[in-house]
Amino acid sequence: MSEAIIAKKAEQVELIAEKMKAAASIVIVDSRGLTVDQDTVLRRSLRESGVEFKVIKNSILTRAAEKAGLDELKDVFVGPSAVAFSNEDVIAPAKVINDFTKTADALEIKGGAIEGAVSSKEEIQALATLPNREGMLSMLLSVLQAPVRNVAYAVKAVAENKEGAA
């Protein structure tokens, strides 16, 4: 192999390792058997969610995972592998891919990493069932508002009772 090719591959490994380190979540899938139309729809959905999706050779992924400190991912890099990286939303890649697997049997989640910790296929699928950040914030807000709302209703009821008695 020529020096130029080796240098290019080393650069790819370094780039992918940096993406793995910076990613809030990584989902690795086997996309073998997807039609071109399905692949296009999947990529568009991921892009709209702010997720980067790439098909990368397993040898490059293995070396990049080692550099990123995700050695346990090596077991997942068997057969064709595509990787979804998200730097902001931890749930987005898992949710989009899990939703897509319901319509496309060919797509299979192999594993991933969440906040730098290696995760199994089952953990990624469980993550996909959680609401996104905005959904979680609205749930938290409604939980925080409930006691205040209940006090307001109680005060209103007392005021109405006093008006009715007067």
Swiss-Prot record:
Gene Ontology MF terms: large ribosomal subunit rRNA binding; structural constituent of ribosome
SUPFAM superfamilies: Ribosomal protein L10-like
Pfam family, one: Ribosomal_L10
Tagged with keyword Glycosyltransferase: no
GO cellular component, one term: large ribosomal subunit
Domain of life assignment: Bacteria
Keyword rRNA-binding: yes
Keyword set, alphabetical order: Ribonucleoprotein, Ribosomal protein, RNA-binding, rRNA-binding
GO biological process: translation
Self-association state and partner proteins as the record states: Part of the ribosomal stalk of the 50S ribosomal subunit. The N-terminus interacts with L11 and the large rRNA to form the base of the stalk. The C-terminus forms an elongated spine to which L12 dimers bind in a sequential fashion forming a multimeric L10(L12)X complex.
Family that this chain belongs to: Belongs to the universal ribosomal protein uL10 family.
PANTHER family from the UniProt entry: 39S RIBOSOMAL PROTEIN L10, MITOCHONDRIAL
Function description: Forms part of the ribosomal stalk, playing a central role in the interaction of the ribosome with GTP-bound translation factors.
HAMAP family registered for this protein in UniProt: Ribosomal_uL10
Name of the protein in its database record: Large ribosomal subunit protein uL10
Native source species: Streptococcus pyogenes serotype M1
Taxonomic lineage: Bacteria, Bacillati, Bacillota, Bacilli, Lactobacillales
